[in-house]
Amino acid sequence: MSTLPERVRERRPLVHAITNCVTMEWVARGLLAAGARPVMARDAAEAPVVAAAADALVLNLGTWSPGLQQAMLEAGQVAARRGIPVVLDPVGAGGTETRTRAALELLERVRVTAVRGNAGEILALAGRDGLVRGVDGPDGRPGPQTERAARAVARRFGCLVAVTGATDLVTDGRRTLAVRAGHPLMSQVPGTGCLATALVAAALAAGTGAGPAGRDRPMEDVDVVAEALLWAGWAGEQAASAASGPGTFAAAFLDRLALRGPLPPGRIAPPLSERLSLYVLVSGATPPDVLEAVLQAGCRMIQFREKRLPLPAQLEAAARVREACRRHGALLVVNDRVDLALAVGADGVHLGQEDLPVAAARRILGPDAVIGATCETAGEARAARDAGADYIGAGPVYVTPSKPDAGEPYGPDVVRRVSEAADLPVVGIGGIGPGRAAPVIAAGAAGVAVISAVLGAPDPGAAARAILDEVRRAKGEVSA
C-alpha cells in the first residue's frame, strides 16, 4: 500500500482553493511541495468554471466578502454535482455572526465533504458558545464539549469534521480518531491551518489507497483526513527541529512536506473518550481468562487495583495485565501507585483525593501518561483539570457492593456536576451494570467504570458487551 504522501504525488490532484488572500501564496506553495497542483481562482464568474475541471475544492472564509461567498456557493454546487471532495474552512465562525451565517449557508447549500476548523469554530457551527482568538482559536486538546459538537455537526450535515489543536480530532459522527502531531511554531506562521485544510482536500482527491486501515476494516475517508493532518503535523515537528524561529520554520516546513517516506506510526488512535466507554477495574485475583473475555468484548480501558498482595506479587500480576492489554490495544492505568505504573510500563495512573497529587504524578510520568482523578465536587474537578488530569472518575453513582465504605450514592448528578465544571472526559463509577449505563451517559459521562457487573457475571464477556453496547447507543455511536 502506498503512503498518503506517495498517493498525492502519484495522482497530482488539481486543488481549486478559494482561500483567503493573506495566505493564498503559502497555501499554493504548500500544495506544490506536497505534490498537488493548486489553482486559486476566486472570481464569481471564473470559480465555477475552474471547479468543473478540479479534483477537489477548498472553501476558506478567511477574507470573506459577499462576492466571495457567491463564488464559493457556485463553485461548491458545481463540485457537488461532479462528486469531487469539497473541504470547508470556517475561519472566524463564532467570531462574528456574519461569518457563522456564511459557513452555515455553505454547509446547507453545498454538499461539503469535510470541515476543518479550531474548537471555537466547530462549537459555533454546532450552535454552542465557543472562543475564537484571531485565526488560531483556543489552545489545547479538544474537550468533550468540542468532541460532542464535532459529532453533532458531522451528523447534521453528513460530512467529516476535523478539529485541530494540540491534539486533532476527526469524526464522521460515529467513528472518531485522535491525531497527535504538530509543534507550537506552527501557530506562529499564518496559514498553517489554511494549508492543512488544502492538504485534506488533496488527500481526499488522491483517494484511500488499496490497503486496509486495520486488521479487519478497510480505509475510510475519516482515516484519510486523519492521515492528512498527521502529514501536516509531522512536517511541522520535523521543521521545528531544523528551525531557529518562525521565519526559518516556514521554509523548513515546505521542505518537509516535499519529503517522501512513511508517516510515523502510532499517532492516530481512538480518542481517550472512546476508550473510556467501558472501563473495567481488575485485581491480582482476576482470572486471566476473564480478563481476556473482557478485552475480546471490546473493553479498551483497564485499571489495575490491588491493595492486598505484597508488592512483588502486585508487580507480577500487573505485568500480566499489561501484556493482555497490549495484545488488544487497550490502555492500562494503575490505581494509586505511580511507582508500580512505572515499573510495569503502564499507560498511566488513577489517583484519589488522598493519593499523590496529580501535578506531582504528571512531573514523574511525563506529558504522555494518562492520569485520572477521582472527584466528587466541581471544585475537585477544576483542580484536577488545572493540575493536568486527563479524565475524571465520578461517583459513587449508585450503591456499590464492591466498595461498601464508598458512602451514600450521588446518582447521575455527580457526573453532570463534575463534567460541567471541568471539560474533561468523565467516567461514572459505582453500582453501574446493564440497564444503568444510559442515564450516566446522558448526564455527560464518556463511559462507565465497572467491577462486579462484569467480573462477577456468569459470562463476563457477554456482560461487557451488553454494557458497552448500551453506552455506545447512548452516545449515538451505533443505532438504537
UniProtKB/Swiss-Prot annotation:
Secretion signal, residue range per the UniProt entry: none
Start and end residues of each stretch annotated as Hydroxyethylthiazole kinase: 1-287
GO MF term set: ATP binding; hydroxyethylthiazole kinase activity; magnesium ion binding; thiamine-phosphate diphosphorylase activity
This protein's GO CC annotations: cytoplasm
Pathway membership, UniProt: Cofactor biosynthesis; thiamine diphosphate biosynthesis; 4-methyl-5-(2-phosphoethyl)-thiazole from 5-(2-hydroxyethyl)-4-methylthiazole: step 1/1; Cofactor biosynthesis; thiamine diphosphate biosynthesis; thiamine phosphate from 4-amino-2-methyl-5-diphosphomethylpyrimidine and 4-methyl-5-(2-phosphoethyl)-thiazole: step 1/1
GO BP terms: thiamine biosynthetic process; thiamine diphosphate biosynthetic process
Domain of life from the UniProt record: Bacteria
Required co-factors: Mg(2+)
EC main group: transferase
Catalytic activity reported: 5-(2-hydroxyethyl)-4-methylthiazole + ATP = 4-methyl-5-(2-phosphooxyethyl)-thiazole + ADP + H(+); 2-[(2R,5Z)-2-carboxy-4-methylthiazol-5(2H)-ylidene]ethyl phosphate + 4-amino-2-methyl-5-(diphosphooxymethyl)pyrimidine + 2 H(+) = thiamine phosphate + CO2 + diphosphate; 2-(2-carboxy-4-methylthiazol-5-yl)ethyl phosphate + 4-amino-2-methyl-5-(diphosphooxymethyl)pyrimidine + 2 H(+) = thiamine phosphate + CO2 + diphosphate; 4-methyl-5-(2-phosphooxyethyl)-thiazole + 4-amino-2-methyl-5-(diphosphooxymethyl)pyrimidine + H(+) = thiamine phosphate + diphosphate
Family: In the N-terminal section; belongs to the Thz kinase family. In the C-terminal section; belongs to the thiamine-phosphate synthase family.
Protein's job: Condenses 4-methyl-5-(beta-hydroxyethyl)thiazole monophosphate (THZ-P) and 2-methyl-4-amino-5-hydroxymethyl pyrimidine pyrophosphate (HMP-PP) to form thiamine monophosphate (TMP).
HAMAP family to which the protein is assigned, alphabetical: Thz_kinase, TMP_synthase
The name this protein goes by in its record: Thiamine biosynthesis bifunctional protein ThiM/ThiE
The organism of origin for this protein: Symbiobacterium thermophilum (strain DSM 24528 / JCM 14929 / IAM 14863 / T)
Gene: thiM/thiE
